[in-house]
């Protein structure tokens, strides 16, 4: 098909769909806007349904390790060499020898030797080896050599308490194994894996074994029930397909005794009529294995609307399907931070119909892979989350070129770099508990993107204060959200105010009404009668001329869980 005929066909289709009288700007939403709006709703849904990852921290963050200052003692012995034995089972990167070498050339007495051993012991504890000991055997220090023995702390066994439930597989979820070094990080990871299922509670105690350095790990594992039900209600839909959206979710917790999680969620527009409506279905399954987690999420969405055409109403319908395979591994953790590597494979397809006839030029089938790093850092009482990811479009799984590729306008073989960060800082003012929350997202690319991969701002999931019926969309962009929340005297409830700002740019930026939005929000959220709620109102602070939106954007989210 030549570019001329392609342009004529697309122009004819889009003219019928988006040629809307100015007075009814919010009545109908263009297909691109509808698709992006649904992607944001789906992303928010999956984030809400995913259980929060528990943070198990069994030891306090270590103090800064400085150079040892040895005391002056009498009598003392000049130490020329420090010999460490028994450290072979420990990782080679542990700086025990480097710490010990600080004693070279020093004249040490009993206090100095104990100080050296204490510093080495503290470093072992800081790295999680809490039952490994550093000992000084009887020796003659007149030789100038100080001998130190490391007694590795090992696990004799991992057992459940007699009153624990038995429907759990420790081998896959708990990386600490009998016969291996006792590492507190392995235990923390195992407890997080066991408690990733919200209906499970797990804790442990360490009991010394009969042999030196041996320890038994005794776990108490309880599961209240294996299923949960959830229902949701919000007004996050669009006027063209139904503003009020409802949904129901069935969770199966630990169905295969692998600390696994499964859910299926269905929903759609509540005020469904013959001329407009939405339907969505999402399924998810994931399970941990030691420091690894694997999962799969699949979703299907369709919407329909009657669009006013030149010669009568036109029935427009869209369908989309998404499948994501997820694999992650925790690379590093200590008492105050952890870093996770993620790898995703994504597929997406969509079709659009006019009066039950497919618009073939709008058919899309794409695939991509994505790698990323996620980091969490506990800084005193504050929590910092930061992440970076790189996404590359592929031709896997029958993916087809985007129509824009034939004319060099865009490509499904995208290269996208994304950054995200969140900082939450609690503080107290006049005996009142408050917190400041900062969120930041950025997307960068050097390839022209199809609309489904572009960055959008304006709405409850990006720059608040806008109703989401219209957004600014481009290849690149960023937004920042600032909230100050006040924990009300009534437990479980919070009042918050926020100010947001965002910008977009890139290839399509020249065709937009503007490049930036700023908005504000005020709301109250909390939990009552097993229902999480969020009631809010927002107002635009800055927008381009001609960018039409409500002067006041109000909304709500209700999520009930049983």
UniProtKB/Swiss-Prot annotation:
POTRA domain ranges (all copies): 77-153
GO MF, one example: protein transmembrane transporter activity
UniProt keyword annotation of Protein transport present: yes
Disulfide bonds: none
GO biological process: monoatomic ion transport; protein secretion by the type V secretion system
Keywords: Cell outer membrane, Ion transport, Membrane, Porin, Protein transport, Transmembrane, Transmembrane beta strand, Transport
Record localization: Cell outer membrane
Pfam (any one): POTRA_3
Domain of life: Bacteria
UniProt GO cellular component terms: cell outer membrane; pore complex; type V protein secretion system complex
Role summary: Potential outer membrane protein component of a toxin-immunity protein module, which functions as a cellular contact-dependent growth inhibition (CDI) system. CDI modules allow bacteria to communicate with and inhibit the growth of closely related neighboring bacteria in a contact-dependent fashion. This protein may be required for secretion and assembly of the CdiA toxin protein.
Family assignment from sequence similarity: Belongs to the TPS (TC 1.B.20) family.
Protein name: Outer membrane transporter CdiB
Organism: Yersinia pestis
